[in-house]
Amino acid sequence: MNHNALPTGLALLIICLLALVFSCGCTGTVGETTPADSDGIRTVTDMRGRTVELPPTIERVVILDDGFVEGLLYRFGMQDRIVGLGGAWTKDYTYSFETTDGTTYEYKNGMNPVRYLIPGLTNLPVLVESGTGINYETLASLEPDVVVLREGAWAFSAGSDEKLEKTVATIESLDIPVVILVGPPFQERPTVDRIGEEIRLVGEVFSHGEDADALAVYLDGQIEEIRKRTADVPVDKKPRMMQLGLSPRARQGGGAGMAWGSDTIESYFIEEIANAKNAYEGTGAFVVVSTEQILVLDPDVIVLPTAQGYHPVSELYTAPYYQNLQELSAVKNHRVYALPWTPYNWAKRLEYPIEAMVIAKAAYPDRFADIQVHEWVLDFYRNVYGVDEATAKELRSAQWLDWMVEAGF
């Protein structure tokens, strides 16, 4: 008989206790939720590495961003939990211009897709007006269970780590937990590669982890499909492409438009997703460029982003103030394309693959000949927001993308 052996019952008890200890272990990765304690309190790790305690369910949320998180909550069926917004991005826009022959073109009912999907957002308090800080008195009065703050969004677009820490400390002094997302402008380099991480974190906060993961995989898949189709383009075959902002502010300042340099996410979409060449080799965003500079750049392809207004292709072709750009190669060869209407889109929202697809097909029409973007975008809205075809068409119109139907793009 082995006198050093443990009694069978005691040995089994020790094994069970060890198994329980190891099964309760957890790591502190971003977005991970720890089990609720006896009071139902959960914890998540946000994108700043902060551990945040949350109530078991979230009934009231204030969101300091520009529609990104609101879009996710619509997908989760939790849009009624939103009680306050971070900025005035829920407007219904109109844009018009006059042609050389006196014809007036007018575009109506342009809006953020989430504004269309959740019209009640227009009735909610806005905590950050243009040129002001957060209204903490209003925030406290809303009694939210959590504040979700997205760095890089217009609602929180400028400032240092010190400003962020002060903002978070002030909110937390009101006994309100804060979860921080880090959007592309505040990352080490501006890419969309961590948007999936943002989506998954929001999913954990609102207990919709599986659905959030499915969406992140879908969005990543759209970008990877573009990259796969253009990956083998030789350097000498890449078209020179320019995002040209037809901004009225640029014209008022003596320029002809705006450009985005190599250090911007706009350039990233051209060079690292579509695998084309940014014709503007400078740096900086919203850089005012003159008529002479644009003519010297002479890009092969031009895409027209939101720039203090919506800018259709016909504006560049027919507006009197752009007649001195008619000798551009892109204009003469009819290789000018309008991007979707995306006001307050500094940090990119869930629709970012639409921009990427328009840019990619504009650069390489032959490589995307099998994709009719005006149909593809309907599938996109259905997959992202779970809407029917009629609503998807309304969203396409809200982003002023019906030109794609008319052009067969």
Locate the predicted segments by residue:
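N-terminal ligand-binding lobe of clamshell/alpha-beta domains
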Residues: C26-F409
